[in-house]
């Protein structure tokens, strides 16, 4: 079994087309409304974060907010295989090439001063979960693709 600190090799493909994706399955701070949570993430936190992410090589950053309304739509998709509804409030995905660059961003003095404390204003950081994996892109803009760009 490989050492957990070792970065696994990317899947086969052209250099510069293999990206890692950090997926954060987030919960909002207890007592915070869905509307306030989304507003803080998109209108307060994102504007403070996005330029720093670009500086450190982030290729893409998306947020998917799961609201009461969108969760209700899931009943239309359930079948014998899709039966379990995830209870996360948001899925935030950050795409980058280098774990080291992302770590450097988190160690940046500006990040430490402005963003670490901001997370506590909207997120339940003790319940939120995360994972990291290689992206395999199959369809983009309605077309079958070979590789991530």
From Swiss-Prot:
Pathway: Secondary metabolite biosynthesis. The keyword Cytoplasm does not apply. Keywords: Lyase. Residues 30-125 form the EthD domain. One of its GO terms (molecular function) is lyase activity. InterPro entries: Dimeric_a/b-barrel (IPR011008), EthD_dom (IPR009799). It catalyses: atrochrysone carboxylate + H(+) = atrochrysone + CO2. Signal peptide: none annotated. It is an enzyme of class 4 (lyase). Its EC number is 4.1.1.-. It holds the Pfam family EthD. Decarboxylase; part of the gene cluster that mediates the biosynthesis of agnestins, dihydroxy-xanthone metabolites. The pathway begins with the assembly and cyclization of atrochrysone thioester by the non-reducing polyketide synthase Agnpks1. The atrochrysone carboxyl ACP thioesterase AgnL7 then breaks the thioester bond and releases the atrochrysone carboxylic acid as the first enzyme-free intermediate. Belongs to the tpcK family. This is Decarboxylase AgnL1. The gene is AgnL1.
């Amino acid at each position: 079994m490989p050492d957990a600190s070792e970065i696994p090799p990317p899947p086969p493909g052209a250099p510069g087309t293999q990206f890692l994706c950090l997926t954060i399955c987030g919960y909002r701070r207890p007592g915070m409304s869905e509307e306030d949570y989304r507003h803080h993430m998109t209108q307060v936190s994102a504007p403070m974060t996005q330029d720093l992410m670009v500086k450190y090589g982030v290729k893409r950053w998306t947020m998917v907010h799961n609201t009461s309304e969108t969760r209700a739509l899931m009943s239309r998709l359930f079948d014998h295989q899709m039966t379990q509804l995830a209870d996360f409030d948001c899925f935030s995905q950050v795409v980058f090439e280098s774990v080291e660059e992302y770590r450097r961003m988190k160690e940046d003095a500006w990040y430490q001063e402005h963003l670490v404390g901001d997370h506590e204003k909207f997120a339940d950081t003790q319940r939120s979960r995360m994972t990291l994996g290689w992206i395999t892109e199959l369809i983009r803009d309605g077309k079958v693709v070979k590789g991530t760009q």
